[in-house]
């Protein structure tokens, strides 16, 4: 994994990144299974993006995995339209805070 990595998408195979804000070498999209092979995460990593849930994992698992790996940046969780977004956000943030992560949620 690039030492200049700034943005990492996990479990979003069709992720695209805004250029020129993020250069191609500063972004990557991987599966959760591939994450272990990319440890330790580079200090340049500013943002991790992951889905609320998918076939392989859910947001709570990502929070635990990143926290255990020592990541202390921003985790942005992508969600479908939710009936009560605030309840989900509150629950995820309570877990993220215990792991030292800042959490954002976006539809």
Language-model features: locations:
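Conserved beta-strand segments of the P-loop GTPase G domain that flank and frequently precede/overlap
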Residues: 9-11, 48-52, 75-79
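Short beta-alpha junction loops
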Residues: 13-14, 75-87, 106-107
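ATP/nucleotide-binding catalytic cores
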Residues: 38-45, 63, 67, 93
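A short helix->loop->beta-strand "cap" motif at the edges of active sites that frequently abuts
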Residues: 69-75
């Amino acid at each position: 994994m690039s030492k200049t990595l700034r943005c990492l998408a996990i479990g979003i195979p069709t992720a695209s990144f805004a250029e020129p804000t993020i250069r191609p070498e500063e972004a990557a999209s991987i599966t959760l299974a591939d994450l272990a092979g990319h440890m330790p995460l580079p200090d340049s990593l500013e943002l991790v993006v992951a889905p609320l849930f998918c076939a392989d994992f859910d947001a709570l698992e990502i929070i635990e995995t990143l926290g255990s790996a020592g990541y202390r940046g921003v985790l942005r969780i992508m969600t479908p339209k939710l009936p009560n977004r605030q309840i989900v956000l509150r629950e995820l943030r309570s877990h993220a805070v215990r792991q030292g992560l800042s959490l954002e949620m976006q539809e």
